[in-house]
């Protein structure tokens, strides 16, 4: 992938959510919402602080993350893949 996010931006590929319940029922509509989990494909150099220094990001390439789908979430198609461009503050957790 040939993309480099700037500053505190992160490129995430959404992971597919299971479309069946634990009991085997196929979920549709709002019950089968888009996943808010994904794999980090690229990260920016960090957040620029008021004093001009750069604070590195906590997430790294390859991390699986849980993110908030917010107004600022940008979806792009890059190399045939649909990816999200998020600010690091939209990432809620790293799955370990």
Swiss-Prot record:
Name the UniProt record assigns to this protein: Co-chaperonin GroES 1
A Pfam family the protein falls into: Cpn10
Job description of the protein: Together with the chaperonin GroEL, plays an essential role in assisting protein folding. The GroEL-GroES system forms a nano-cage that allows encapsulation of the non-native substrate proteins and provides a physical environment optimized to promote and accelerate protein folding. GroES binds to the apical surface of the GroEL ring, thereby capping the opening of the GroEL channel.
Residue runs in coiled coils: none
Compartments (UniProt record): Cytoplasm
Keyword Cytoplasm included in the entry's annotation: yes
UniProt-recorded Gene Ontology molecular function terms: ATP binding; metal ion binding; protein folding chaperone; protein-folding chaperone binding; unfolded protein binding
Top-level taxonomic group: Bacteria
Gene (UniProt): groES1
Organism of origin: Vibrio cholerae serotype O1 (strain ATCC 39315 / El Tor Inaba N16961)
């Amino acid at each position: 992938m040939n993309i480099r996010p700037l500053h505190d931006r992160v490129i995430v590929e959404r992971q597919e959510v299971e479309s069946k319940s634990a009991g085997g029922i196929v979920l549709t509509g709002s019950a089968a919402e888009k996943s808010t989990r994904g794999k980090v494909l690229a990260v920016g150099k960090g957040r620029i602080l008021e004093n001009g220094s750069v604070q590195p990001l906590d997430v790294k390439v390859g991390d699986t993350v849980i993110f908030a789908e917010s107004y600022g979430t940008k979806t792009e198609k890059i190399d045939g893949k649909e990816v999200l461009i998020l600010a690091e503050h939209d990432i809620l957790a790293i799955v370990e």
